């Protein structure tokens, strides 16, 4: 039975058949096209969540549909016992975008990409690792050990590894924690799941200097910021003089298909050897064909520039509203956080949904926007027109929560 259930019926079926690790999702969706989605009852929404920064080209983009359809009709899955052309081509293209010699390991998600980075760190012969408070790197055990959110870790203690967590953006704390016994330091250029937190200027450059001095690897988790999300192919490229040893990718790379990558350079690129790591589905030709289509379309359609212009229009428009519930906007490109003066983000998320806009509340006082990279002016204008009413719906008109 598909395609005929109502919102209520589909939600009830979810609750009866799927594990409760996500709780009950807030909305059943059945169709998408471009920046728009439709629920099972036929209501239309503008998508400012983008599958949590996954749908770089929106929904049902012709380039991805064609690439996937063509690939599955010729070669679907062969495993890593054999060579297929799409993963080779995608790895080569990624290395071109990095502008450096290196090697790529393909997997299926950001957590898996960070697990591979964890193992690369162990293969240096050192075991100590440094990550940041508030950071999010995934929920598998190694990635969870790196994640700096105790609430997510607590049910699964003890976790693997000797990991020290330091305040995000604090270069002095980082320097104090990193020693010649430190295998790697892992940092998100922007903390997405922690509420779109941007570090101080010079932080990544300082991290590079600190790790270089101790011979530690610098791992940048670009799972959320990579693949054009911030107006650069990779966010670290906006920071002069920063060359990481490892970059982890996922989300936008597959454009909606499960695809992650761990990209390593220099000595880090040579550490994984046969038998050290692997995944049956990693480098799947269909997912890699989609990844190639994403990269080609971003370049062909000038989407890096579109991200910058759409971001500027969104940020300026939101801040110019002068709404008492808006404190400021932070982030980069089309990864933006509307910081509220009151912890009303979950209520604002629901009010936006009621108004036909899908947004996300990663923190009590932050509304996160992660729309497709091809977001148009009309969609930006529609969001800006609706936002005051959305915020008014959860306040008394003075920025304070309704009783």
From Swiss-Prot:
Cofactor annotation comment: Binds 1 pyridoxal phosphate per subunit.
Superkingdom as given in the UniProt entry: Bacteria
GO BP term, pick one: L-arginine biosynthetic process
MF-aspect GO terms: identical protein binding; N2-acetyl-L-ornithine:2-oxoglutarate 5-aminotransferase activity; pyridoxal phosphate binding
InterPro entries linked to this entry: AcOrn/SuccOrn_fam, Aminotrans_3, Aminotrans_3_PPA_site, Class-III_PLP-dep_AT, PyrdxlP-dep_Trfase, PyrdxlP-dep_Trfase_major, PyrdxlP-dep_Trfase_small
Pfam families assigned to the protein according to its UniProt record, in alphabetical order: Aminotran_3
Residues that bind pyridoxal 5'-phosphate: 110-111, 136, 221-224, 280
Gene responsible for this protein: argD
Family: Belongs to the class-III pyridoxal-phosphate-dependent aminotransferase family. ArgD subfamily.
Pathway membership: Amino-acid biosynthesis; L-arginine biosynthesis; N(2)-acetyl-L-ornithine from L-glutamate: step 4/4
Entry-annotated residues carrying N6-(pyridoxal phosphate)lysine: 251
Recorded GO CC terms: cytoplasm
Organism of provenance: Streptomyces avermitilis (strain ATCC 31267 / DSM 46492 / JCM 5070 / NBRC 14893 / NCIMB 12804 / NRRL 8165 / MA-4680)
Class of this enzyme: transferase
Additional remarks: May also have succinyldiaminopimelate aminotransferase activity, thus carrying out the corresponding step in lysine biosynthesis.
UniProtKB keywords: Amino-acid biosynthesis, Aminotransferase, Arginine biosynthesis, Cytoplasm, Pyridoxal phosphate, Transferase
PANTHER family in the record: ACETYLORNITHINE AMINOTRANSFERASE, MITOCHONDRIAL, AMINOTRANSFERASE CLASS III
CDD domains xrefs: OAT_like
Location (main, coarse): cytoplasm
EC number: 2.6.1.11
Quaternary structure, from the entry: Homodimer.
Compartmental location: Cytoplasm
Name recorded for this polypeptide: Acetylornithine aminotransferase
Catalytically driven reaction(s): N(2)-acetyl-L-ornithine + 2-oxoglutarate = N-acetyl-L-glutamate 5-semialdehyde + L-glutamate
Cofactor(s) required, per the database record: pyridoxal 5'-phosphate
Residues binding N(2)-acetyl-L-ornithine: 139, 279
